[in-house]
């Protein structure tokens, strides 16, 4: 049984009701609908018919009017469409620049149906904007509205406006063009008034020169009526009168500027007038007398004595010699005095030149340096250094970077001993966070605990069990690839204690991040899997903790597994100096299970116990100092740095210097994603507001003066830039001999990369891993390595340099993928580091030329010889393998190769065959060898191309 459907607008026609009234009835009856074209069931339609009998439509009066005058029925619709027409606010943009009486016109424009009222602007302009406010006045225009109903449906496309301006026939085309221009330049709308459009266009061109001179005029003479034209800055420079009015108010210095500018900008459009004006300027500067200046300034300034005197004093220096005796005397005396001073200076300098310090006998260098820097250090001319290198067979320029060995060689020739400065170990723990002034205000602070260990030994899972959170599920492949800083509240002896945990990566590529974690920590928790034992990253973590002189607590994880052997783990750790307490050592070892949450309380108690022994204190009542744990560039928030406050308190609004970056702290977010106003010692927060992304591991400090912070950051940035340039020059240094030989052999290949990662630590880890790849035949060039998303600028750089873009845990900006497809740029995205390294190594191997490898086919023995007209045929017996026609063969006689050629003919039982297997006899003929003997061995082989690996390529060289 089908149910009938009725559309709402059909029902409205049937009931002679407006759609809005019918929709209102649907709302009262609770009937669902989307629009007036929706369908409803017959039952609902019957309900509506019953309700319509008693319904009093609120639009009854308009419907009655509509019967008498149909255009009025559509009057409410234009009120809605007026909002759409009002979007085209170009006419409003014209009015603010027009005279004040036009400001009253915009309220009349939003109502296009009232167009016939616009042609009477003189008197009715003011009352008619007030008329649309009332709802009743639309009745009088109902008589002339028979004409508007036709253009009413076309209100959105603007045919109604030309009807309004039919009186101005010539003004109709410009507004349509100007409707597109106003969004770019609202001033362009002035062109609607055609008689003044041309003048204003010329004005805009000449408005540039006098513009700076007029703002000062406005302040001193606010009451003058002539100040109204200055908004139109153009007409002022053309006539001389407005210029004289402006100069009256100018300063002393600006008077002379007006004198010069008047001649410079006079007749700006004509070249001849430029030359004349420039000549006049020169004549004014060189020849004009004080009396002539007085006449000129009287014309311009109205004989203002003060400004004339000032202009005279300003124009005195460029004057040539004048017959007045006073002026030439003073400059002559000055020149004599100045010459005497110069001579005395030269006399003073002459004895100082030979008094220079003698060359040093001992120098200390920090690394490679340029020839110019070496010459400055040893106090010798650059030419002498270059000559010394030339005699040693090294052609160098003044800006070339020299290796430490080369510097020692040059210094030895000059009789100077060289000492190389030792770099500080990065893993040493920072202890200078506390100053002597902090000793009187120390307070106990929470411990910073770093969880370290081999990859997949359960570090993050252990931290999850402590935090009761699922952090490991968010890491790609279950591998931690950042330093995560987490704040945990631990209950111990009925009291709440706070502990800050740092979760470091265990993958081998993240060595620098583990070293950084050990450097800022107070306690290191070494996680070792009970079923896996001590692994390479476990040993590395032990060395980092020992270098930082940090106490180590060993957590033997995964004891719930059947293959767990905790005692074997303890035995292995003793080989690296970690002896458990029960064996007489001083290392705390706790067997735990992160999944089963076993012995976690014991581990936390041990952490708090060691923290009490360490006496961890800080001064919270001072500006903050600490270390940048991690940093990255966020698409929405900008540079974001994870800071660990080690001393003092960091507050919102502080001026911060982190390495070579500085900024003001705009916001701080803790590990739970909540905004905080202050971060006390031992707390890690994300900080927003830095100008650039700082390097992970940099120390930060809060300063009170922004200028000092900026200067310190710029100084550090300059030092980093110099060291980076020196390292880049040293890394790309190639001798001429090796360069030419590699170029001849075609072995000089480069793979250009652009690396973008989520955080700075990932960038460091990937760069370190890439540098460990063999680069004997394929050199890796990282053109750009930075945190942040992949942008169109990166794509343009890759397209220009034929580079591959590598994205690690990052995204693409809008338009980057489209630009990459347009420029055929390869973008690779990864979230696990070892997959990235495998692909890069594969790409490098693909650039190597394939190797030609001999593949053995078989051997045959010559047992008979048959001379024929075409040549000598050797009757052979295949010993092993097979013989293939057209394969390469070697003929061995008494273990020596006597011929190498191609097997041109192969027959068996007088039939040509393609191959003969082992155990069969065959006839063999070679085109270029006929001296067969019985007992010769035929060695058959073929050459195949094989992809070369980086290891094999390096071994071959």
From Swiss-Prot:
Entry keywords, A to Z: Cytoplasm, GTP-binding, Initiation factor, Nucleotide-binding, Protein biosynthesis
Molecular function per GO: GTP binding; GTPase activity; translation initiation factor activity
Positions of the UniProt region annotated as G4: 557-560
Positions of the tr-type G domain: 444-617
Residue ranges, compositional bias (Basic and acidic residues): 163-188, 250-259, 266-275
GO cellular component, one term: cytosol
InterPro entries the UniProt entry points to: EF-G-like_DII (IPR053905), IF2_II (IPR044145), IF2_N (IPR006847), P-loop_NTPase (IPR027417), Small_GTP-bd (IPR005225), T_Tr_GTP-bd_dom (IPR000795), TF_IF2_bacterial-like (IPR000178), TIF_IF2 (IPR015760)
Residue numbers binding GTP: 453-460, 503-507, 557-560
Comp. bias intervals (Pro residues): 107-161, 209-242
Region called G2, residue ranges: 478-482
G3, as annotated region: 503-506
Localization (cell): Cytoplasm
Keyword Transmembrane: no
Presence of the UniProt keyword Protein biosynthesis in the record: yes
Pfam families: EF-G_D2, GTP_EFTU, IF-2, IF2_N
Coiled coil location: none
Region named G1: 453-460
Function: One of the essential components for the initiation of protein synthesis. Protects formylmethionyl-tRNA from spontaneous hydrolysis and promotes its binding to the 30S ribosomal subunits. Also involved in the hydrolysis of GTP during the formation of the 70S ribosomal complex.
UniProt xrefs under PANTHER family: TR-TYPE G DOMAIN-CONTAINING PROTEIN, TRANSLATION INITIATION FACTOR IF-2-RELATED
Family, as annotated: Belongs to the TRAFAC class translation factor GTPase superfamily. Classic translation factor GTPase family. IF-2 subfamily.
HAMAP family in UniProt: IF_2_B
Protein name as annotated: Translation initiation factor IF-2
Gene designation per UniProt: infB
